[in-house]
């Protein structure tokens, strides 16, 4: 059987923790930041965990990271 390829686009966007959680960056921190509050910008810094319904899709794109 041939090797499975990792989707490089997914590898750049997701990080797998030691416990197996898949984290992603939150949207909304690129531009138009002056109208957003400090608290909101701080909350956007915290990585989010992907939803359970999307987990299998990401796992297929990252075969060797889980």
Swiss-Prot record:
Keyword field: Ribonucleoprotein, Ribosomal protein
Family annotation (SUPFAM superfamilies): L35p-like
GO molecular-function terms, A-Z: structural constituent of ribosome
UniProt xrefs under InterPro entries: Ribosomal_bL35, Ribosomal_bL35-like, Ribosomal_bL35_CS, Ribosomal_bL35_sf
Name of the protein: Large ribosomal subunit protein bL35
Family annotation (PROSITE patterns): RIBOSOMAL_L35
Similarity annotation: Belongs to the bacterial ribosomal protein bL35 family.
Residue ranges, compositional bias (Basic residues): 24-43
Taxonomic path: Bacteria, Pseudomonadati, Dictyoglomota, Dictyoglomia, Dictyoglomales
GO CC, alphabetical: cytosolic large ribosomal subunit
GO biological process, one term: translation
The keyword Iron is annotated on this UniProt entry: no
UniProt-listed PANTHER family: 54S RIBOSOMAL PROTEIN BL35M, LARGE RIBOSOMAL SUBUNIT PROTEIN BL35M
Gene that encodes it: rpmI
HAMAP family on file: Ribosomal_bL35 (MF_00514)
Any one Pfam family match given in the protein's UniProt record, by short name: Ribosomal_L35p
UniProt region (Disordered), positions on chain: 24-44
